[in-house]
Amino acid sequence: MAFRPLVATAIFAASLAVSPALAQSSSPITGLDALREWNLVVLGNLESSSEVEGRTFVGGNLSGNSSNYAIRPLAQSTSGQPGLTVVGDVNGGHKNLNNGSGAVVGGNVNSGFNLNGAAQTVKVGGTISNTNVNQNKVLSGLGNSDPAFVVGLQQQKEQLVSSLDRLSFDMGTLTSNSQFAVQGNRGVFTAKPNADGLAVFEISSADLDKIGEIQFALNGAETVVVNVSGRNILLNDNFIGGTNNLGEHVIWNFPDAENIRVTTAWGGSILAPSADAETGNYIQGSAVFGNLKQNGEMHIGTYKGGNIGTPGGGSSSGGSSSGGDPVPIPEPGLWGLFALGVGGLIYARRFRRRRDG
């Protein structure tokens, strides 16, 4: 039988067909590094009529009225991330991409983009409509011409979902070492950081409901985690002294949250990977939601704090671990090679049957 030669031929043909982009892969951005990279991460769908000052990642579809992205000039991403990444489709009103930030879209751009500022690069897996190219570089149909394009985006989403779920869970198991006290209508958070600069608070949604003001004393803490239990969360408190770039060091973790509503300007990064959220005012910091209806701005002051080790193993302000390690997922290049190899094998076997018949 010629079965083995056919397999070898198919795999060899597949290896020749694989593009360099398919055969290579960069290190995934996961865990706390995702909060450092993106101003807003929505693992599912984002409906927006507002704006994001930094970078945005959407794991599902982007819809809603006209919205704005990367409205503040940003240093170039060391990992090459554009101002806007959407794994699914872009629908609704025109989306404004600013400061030459560019976009990557796995599906179709039905709404159209306004490409403002310096020349931008837009990569689209499907079709793009209602967009004036001018001096910009707009590539569409990449889902057909490069199989790795859409596969890579889907795997990027899967790794973010896995690692951010794990990060929220791990943070939720950290032992509290700092003091929360209610003083009249005010909740006072007094950080008592450990040797690694980590301060941890543990409160409930009921505790938040009892107060109308929030005050922080960070006391030199590099990383502050506020674990909040409860499924339904209302964030309607005022921050004494303003939001004050709290999001660079403070993470509000909602590991149990299913619904979150933000009605006041919120200080601190938010980690709620399973929550359906709605914002009516700005958040200063990074934010992670399951799905989001956005009517309030996202302000930079994204997370810059230290890393958090696994519970029981201490914490780290540096090092290689950023917390929330994802469940391993095969690299896009391996999937592409496997798929092309199988396709070549099937074709070869069918050709042999036709020849022998």
Predicted regions and their residues:
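Bacterial N-terminal signal peptides that target proteins for export
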Residues: 1-8
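A short, hydrophobic C-terminal helix/tail in secreted or cell-surface proteins
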Residues: 330-348
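Ser/Thr/Gly/Pro-rich low-complexity, disordered linker/stalk segments of secreted
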Residues: 308-326
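Sec/Tat signal peptide C-region and signal peptidase I cleavage site
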Residues: 18-23
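Bacterial N-terminal signal peptides
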Residues: 8-17
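Long, polar low-complexity repeats
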Residues: 24-101, 106-113, 159-310
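C-terminal membrane-anchoring or membrane-association module
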Residues: 345-357
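Hydrophobic alpha-helical segments and helix pairs
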Residues: 114-168
